[in-house]
């Protein structure tokens, strides 16, 4: 793992030099602020929490994560760059982790830029900052899980339109799973519904979003991240044979 920091810094610099990064982060922050202020009832309730604001994140991440994911492996799909990477003493795990962590940091920066809403909530009323902290952590974990999915899809193909369709389609499917569960509740066997509930990241996020940051739910997101990063590493190893 000696070269992991090198990969991390290189990807972070790549994001910093790409105008699309700033556009996607700005769009995420502005939409968070606009929708959070206009649709959240917490302004009327004395600013006690940011519950509705955080409920928007699974949908807003569809824009941000998709944009960041498409930049992860774009350079390495170039034959010259791919051949050069083969000559360097860099393992696939280092490449995957370094790039993923850099993208996750950008997500964290975008999330941190929504902090003024926390200031507003505290100004308007007695906000529960412990719950808000838990909500921010939950949102960060959700972003990491979405990003790991995008990382895997981008390792499969270099065609941006295919990446866009697959990433958006898969993340939309995941995001709408809870709605499908409501429809299946009285039509499917209970064990099927329970199994799908256990796999639904939105319901998990909803639990964390309520301020209940349990080890069980946190491990779910960590496991999802590790699973898709492992799948990404396997895919890259197969393609570089």
Each model region followed by its residue ranges:
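Secretory targeting signals
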Residues: 34-37, 44-47, 53-54, 60, ...
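Hydrophobic/aromatic residues in alpha-helical transmembrane segments
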Residues: 65-69, 148-149, 231-232
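Long, hydrophobic alpha-helical segments
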Residues: 53-75
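Aromatic- and glycine-rich beta-strand/loop motifs that create alpha-glucan
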Residues: 1-23, 241
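Pore- or pathway-lining transmembrane helices of multi-pass membrane proteins that form conduits
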Residues: 21-28, 160-178
């Amino acid at each position: 793992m000696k070269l992991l920091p090198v990969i991390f810094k290189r990807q972070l610099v790549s994001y910093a030099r790409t105008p699309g990064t700033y556009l996607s982060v700005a769009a995420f922050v502005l939409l968070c602020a606009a929708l959070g202020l206009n649709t959240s009832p917490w302004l009327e309730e004395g600013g006690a929490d940011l519950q509705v604001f955080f409920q928007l994140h699974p949908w807003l991440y569809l824009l941000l994560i998709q944009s960041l994911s498409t930049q992860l492996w774009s350079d390495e799909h170039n034959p010259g760059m791919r051949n050069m990477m083969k000559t360097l003493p860099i393992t696939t795990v280092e490449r995957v982790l370094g790039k993923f962590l850099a993208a996750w940091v950008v997500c964290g920066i975008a999330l941190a830029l929504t902090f003024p809403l926390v200031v507003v909530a505290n100004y308007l009323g007695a906000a529960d900052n412990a719950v808000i902290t838990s909500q921010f952590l939950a949102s960060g974990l959700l972003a990491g899980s979405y990003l790991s999915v995008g990382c895997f899809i981008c390792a499969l193909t270099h065609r941006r339109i295919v990446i866009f369709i697959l990433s958006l389609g898969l993340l939309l499917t995941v995001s709408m799973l809870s709605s499908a569960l409501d429809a299946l509740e009285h039509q499917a066997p209970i064990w099927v519904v329970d199994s799908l509930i256990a796999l639904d990241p939105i319901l998990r996020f909803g639990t964390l979003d309520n301020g209940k940051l349990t080890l069980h739910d946190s491990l779910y997101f960590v496991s999802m991240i590790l699973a898709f990063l492992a799948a990404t590493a396997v895919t890259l190893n197969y393609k570089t044979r």
